[in-house]
Amino acid sequence: MATRTGVVCSAHGQSFVKVSQVVTSIPPSYLAQFREPVGYLDFARFGPPAHAVVELTARLAERAMTAGPSTVDDLMRQEARAEAAAARLCGAGAGNVVLLPNTSTGLFGVALGLAGEVAVSPAEFPANTYPWVRAGRARVRWLRPGPVTPESVRDALSDEVTAVSVSAVDFHTGYRADLAALREVVGDRLLVVDGIQGFGVLDEPWSAADVVVVGGQKWLRAGWSTGFAALSDRALDRLSPVLSGWTGVVDPGVFDGAPHPVAPGAAAWSVTNPNPIAAGALATALELVESAGVPALHERIVERSDELAEAVRSAGGTVAAPWARRAGILSFTLPGVPAQVVGRALARAGVTATARSGRVRLSPHASTKAEAVALVAAALRPLRG
């Protein structure tokens, strides 16, 4: 479990906790939930789910297979369970959370509902650029290339900018955005955060954002087609729920042939009934995160990342931008050795990693064992120039 101390900070009417000290340990019961291979270091791409997630998914699917009079209603209760767990972890009210099948759906919902201009980096993962370009409602103001810092955002702001969209963690370099500082710079504008590369393993002030959109298939280890969005009251007031369906209204079960008023809260962003099996998987994964504690998970991940970075440097590699504020992503190059060659060498050694855009990306989780570091070191050693 994890215990923490901190102080309550506020910015532009919003309060959030800034952690000042964390004392951590991970329960063995949490670690026993996972059985990925020792060399699996690709959680930034996909996180193999826990035993509890797989088992619940199977149980719910079996219930659906033998459906009776109350089965559908019983299965649909997983939605409220998942929304409540997500709300607890991001510091939102349960009425401010809506389930989604993926991050892109949530970002498209925001893009379709926003007027004015949105500031976003062209270096973002495409899930955080295409919605703004395709929706065509808000004009796009591109930030200068490089990490999305408070300074780069401040330089791009104008009266026309109504929102800033940023990833909590850069998918390519592992740069971790300073959400609290961005909140200060953005002011009364909406701060939209793609949290897929950090939620559940970073102890961030998520409530500093107006919109947090998270897919559950990576660090949350909930499997595909899982996710949620948390929207502040300000976001709900300013964004139009354009991407909203029959379940996003008052009395959705009353079929009277007339359009109904928009539902209160984040429920207005509902398009249709969620997959209850996916909702159950997400709820279980989120509750497992709660059982271990986000600070404990983050501390273990940073420790393993440090060990991997040392193995890379010992082999003559260069770690891309060793940020002081780190998440779980470690990108590197080996001088004179193409990234694809390094990736194949790692694969032969039993290491699962991503080789892309001239770099190799390693991304361990709290369940990653020390033996993984030895596998990486052994794979890189013969490649030294």
Where are these predicted regions, by residue range?
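Pyridoxal 5′-phosphate
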Residues: 8-385
